[in-house]
């Protein structure tokens, strides 16, 4: 029984997902349906958490727009995600960056990781 479920999950996993970690700045292109129109919407921000659960994997992206913090949770293997681009790699020492919610200005900056 579990083999059948695992086979179905393996078929639905996306293969073209780039490797990114918390602290990285990513741009996610998402398909948005408005009425009968379908268009791509871009969301760029810092990855503050990643949950790895095979098909149910997700990641949270945070950006600040007009002084308001906006967080969006994306399902990693969702069909609504068109592409993910890693713009900048961040150097952090934690897996969850929830402390960025309370910080503003220079204290919310993340150093760049050079590899």
From Swiss-Prot:
Keywords: Ribonucleoprotein, Ribosomal protein. GO terms for cellular component: cytosolic large ribosomal subunit. Gene3D superfamilies: 2.30.30.790. The keyword Repeat does not apply. It holds the Pfam family Ribosomal_L19. The keyword Repressor does not apply. One of its GO terms (molecular function) is structural constituent of ribosome. PROSITE patterns: RIBOSOMAL_L19. It comes from the Bacteria. Transmembrane segments: none annotated. GO terms for biological process: translation. PANTHER family: LARGE RIBOSOMAL SUBUNIT PROTEIN BL19M, RIBOSOMAL PROTEIN L19. NCBIfam families: rplS_bact (TIGR01024). Belongs to the bacterial ribosomal protein bL19 family. This protein is located at the 30S-50S ribosomal subunit interface and may play a role in the structure and function of the aminoacyl-tRNA binding site. This is Large ribosomal subunit protein bL19. It comes from Buchnera aphidicola subsp. Schizaphis graminum (strain Sg).
